[in-house]
Amino acid sequence: MNPNVACLVIQFLLLGAGQASPWTSPPVKSDHPFLFMWNAPTELCESRFGLPLDLSHFHLVSSTLKSATDQSISIFYNDRFGIVPYVDEDTGEFVDEGLPQLVDLKEHRELAEDDIEFYIPVDQPGLAVLDLEEWRPQWVRNWGGKDIYRQISVERVKARNGSLSDDEAEDRAKILFERAAQRYFLRSLRIGKRLRPKRLWGYYLYPDCYNYDYNQDMDEFTGECPDIEKERNDDLLWLWGASTALYPSIYLEVALRDSAQARRFVRHRMVEAVRVSTLANGSYSVPVYAYIRPVYKDSTDEYMSEMDLVSTIGEAAALGAAGVVSWGDMNVTDSEDSCFDARRHLVDVMNPYILNVSTASRLCSEALCQSRGRCVRKRWDDDVFLHLDPRRYRIERRRGPLTVSGGGPSRDDVDWFDRHFDCMCYDESPCRSVETFNAVQDDPFHAGSRSSGRRPSVGSYFLLMAAATSLLGALLG
């Protein structure tokens, strides 16, 4: 064995004896520590306009159409899951009585069971996402347009007991609302987990940390989640303990495009999601799947830049997320032009980056975690990412699909992974081992000299993709 490799092995023996990070569940798709998932009705691009999209680099592909069943990602909107009480924002109509306090949970269970059996006819691994955005289970978080649920709840209490003061009526209404909301949220999860236990059940947008203050002062924006919001997330311990996956959103608005603030925004949201994932059991992390969009949140046709893919996907992968779900609505498919734009974005921008992160995540998992865990950034605020080293690897397109050239991990790759990443193992037993480190490449190219271990800056990952498309070549050169 080369002396340098021997020293590296000894180092890993010393560092890998314990397991500092919590463990988590294995990935939905084996051998893919970080999953890329597509959830949009883009099959319409081919059926309407003859423009198929290249989704071959996504590990799971599904549709959001109401008619689509047996999808690997099943998202349940308010018209697809039992009884969902809410007040229609446009008409003011009370749908299903409007309030969680008024839901017949027996009827809700029966209807939800029918919906689950329709949309998930066979129990197989995948995601099951409950999308209830009309109201929130915590009284204090129903602000703005959602204040209507507090108003109506108070009015109902006063109607039953006119002798109560305003404060007394509100206190009583708060208790009744939160008790019913918690019961509704938990019962819905319980129904899903009982009928389709192989699915990962959770609520879209949970957890959130409401770090939107860049709208007030972009220059001073730190991205930090307000302490009060973290405390409120602590109060949702009952929800985190019942969820088998967490589905936070890291959508970016156009105002954050290509900015350091975008990365801060996402980083703190992901750190909070990971923190919340261990609240119910400090030694176990509930899998986190972050929702992204191919376009900016407040746009229908402006696609995410390469830099913002790093700020969203790159951050999520480095901080220990199990994957990202790229969600799109009908705007992606409503015209031939929109389908063409989506196809061009995938080919020129997104697919090369997906291949980059997928490959680097797998190599790191193999090198550090024996493929029995995913790599997680040691220091959450470091600008290090699960990217291929552009000095060794190339992503190329030569008369066919994108491919990665460069071989397996070198000693420098493994050393760099070890310096910056730990393992989050897929069970309670330690997954870091010295065995795989003997298998790193010991070829003449790397044997003579060791680099400093420093990689080019974050932005230089684009160099790796320069050969993939002429567009990227133009952008970078």
Residues covered by each model-derived region:
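N-terminal signal peptide
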Residues: 2-32, 450-455, 470-477
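A solvent-exposed, charged loop/short amphipathic helix patch at secondary-structure junctions
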Residues: 94-99, 142-178
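C-terminal GPI-anchoring signal of eukaryotic secretory precursors
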Residues: 445-462
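Extracellular cysteine-rich, disulfide-stabilized repeat modules
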Residues: 375-376, 386, 419-427
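Alpha-helical scaffolding within the catalytic cores
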Residues: 59-61, 114, 225-237, 268-277, ...
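Aromatic-lined carbohydrate-recognition surfaces of secreted/lumenal glycan-active proteins
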Residues: 172-232, 266, 281-297
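Substrate-binding cleft of secreted/luminal carbohydrate-active enzymes
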Residues: 25-26, 30-44, 71, 76-79, ...
